[in-house]
Amino acid sequence: MNDEQLLRYSRHLLLEDIDIAGQEKLLNSHVLIIGAGGLGSACAPYLAAAGVGQITLVDHDRVELTNLQRQIMHQNNSVGMSKVWSGKRFLNNLNPGITIHAIEQKADEALLEELVMQVSVVIDCTDNFITRHLINRISLKHGKTLVSGASIGFDAQISVFDFRQASSPCYACVFPPDPHFVETSCASMGVFSPLVGIIGSLQAAQALQILIGFGEPLLGRLLIWNARNSQIDEIKIQRNLDCPVCGAH
């Protein structure tokens, strides 16, 4: 690290679990964030500020006025702009010493197959089950660690699936694919604005722990947050041997 980096990341360097070696791991890391909305708007800035060397941001949406209630990576002058380019502008201003890749495309199977294999950690900040299941399947296929978060109304959840370990459960073990499932969204159900910030920040924290290799990430655990009463519950996740996605791996 150069002198500017030593100063910028000095508060990390004081932490025994991070120190210079851990910070250098971050600077040499590449993370994929899928979704530049509410969760991504909290997750991406903390990863950028922490010094993750490369961040690939994927989203096909454009910023709308209704997004600004919670998506703090975007501003009034971002309305109508691509979310990933708005996000790239924000993150570059926050930390010009890292690289932000903006991919203005829908996260379909072909794109994810190309991107997932290039990164160390995949962070799911999307808002629908179809995409979450696709991200889960491709992360499993390539043996990547997946940090999954979701938030709607006053309820949210986060978990980590480490597909470097053959014994790891997957997202489908907890939420099996259901062709008859009716999607809900913030547009129809609403969302408590600070909640996406809490979960997105936790996603960033989990990713940093995994990249550096310290502490006890939420492996095999689902953390559930109720913002009405600030109640936090934790559920242990067991691998489902009959899971249609990971049951054979």
Predicted regions span which residues?
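Adenine nucleotide-associated cytosolic modules
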Residues: 1-249
